[in-house]
Amino acid sequence: MVFRIASSPYTHNQRQTSRIMLLVLLAAVPGIAAQLWFFGWGTLVQILLASVSALLAEALVLKLRKQSVAATLKDNSALLTGLLLAVSIPPLAPWWMVVLGTVFAVIIAKQLYGGLGQNPFNPAMIGYVVLLISFPVQMTSWLPPHEIAVNIPGFIDAIQVIFSGHTASGGDMNTLRLGIDGISQATPLDTFKTSVRAGHSVEQIMQYPIYSGILAGAGWQWVNLAWLAGGVWLLWQKAIRWHIPLSFLVTLALCATLGWLFSPETLAAPQIHLLSGATMLGAFFILTDPVTASTTNRGRLIFGALAGLLVWLIRSFGGYPDGVAFAVLLANITVPLIDYYTRPRVYGHRKG
């Protein structure tokens, strides 16, 4: 009998960083397609701008640090950062905003800490928050979904608005944001928060065109379901684990249900929280970032639950309509503490 002698490693895992990132990029296709369908070609233009900006910014920093540019860019992490930021901002936001946010995310939030694996905060969400705080008007100027929109920009119009601020016929963002009722439309979460503060009843708010969807906001419910489909595929491919998405969604649903039962006239119903804004994108594509999330199974459950609670608190009582980005970054801060207290006990070790 011949025994084969081999050196370590004795187990082989094909889940290299580049492959996992590629799986996440592929899983984003349904969500991207849904956003293209409901919000137009601007989403694709923003993705292209963000992708090019991310690759150039990363290449520049790597060149300055005298590191291999080609080898690092092949891990696809820069592309994923650009993609996540691009789908998080309004589709017709000015071109310089997505470039600025992407460059900030890659250089400051990622490479300044040492590159992939060293950054404590999700780079895409850092870029998003910087843009949201600096340019709140542009970052909240979402188009109405095509089913309730009056003016639907084509591909050429989308490019012209992004780069010049006007369509070929002279239309601007105020014109494009008009809904079928002649009123500028906002996202379902923004509409709900603004209307409640204006003294409108929930019954009145639910009559707005933006809530004409079957389950939640028009268009947004299908966008979230598309991101959910991509997330389920990631779970099936074992590219992510179930702990964070499940604990995040369960906690958000539980908090939203309890809040709605106690104060139905001022707080949004659970289906609006689950199927509006960046809920499913955050649950499966942002919170599950292996670098900035907890690394233990118990820690992942705590991390996801904390993020779900923070999203509900910010949406319900904060100054911003959608709290996913802030919740992710606040939860990122707690990761070292969570990991410290959820470390698996070493076999045979007793607490001293």
From Swiss-Prot:
InterPro entries: NqrB/RnfD, RnfD_bac
Chain positions with FMN phosphoryl threonine modification: 187
Gene Ontology biological process terms in this record: electron transport chain; transmembrane transport
Keywords: Cell inner membrane, Cell membrane, Electron transport, Flavoprotein, FMN, Membrane, Phosphoprotein, Translocase, Transmembrane, Transmembrane helix, Transport
Family: Belongs to the NqrB/RnfD family.
Oligomer and partners: The complex is composed of six subunits: RsxA, RsxB, RsxC, RsxD, RsxE and RsxG.
The protein's name in its UniProt record: Ion-translocating oxidoreductase complex subunit D
Species, as recorded: Escherichia coli O157:H7
Taxonomic lineage: Bacteria, Pseudomonadati, Pseudomonadota, Gammaproteobacteria, Enterobacterales
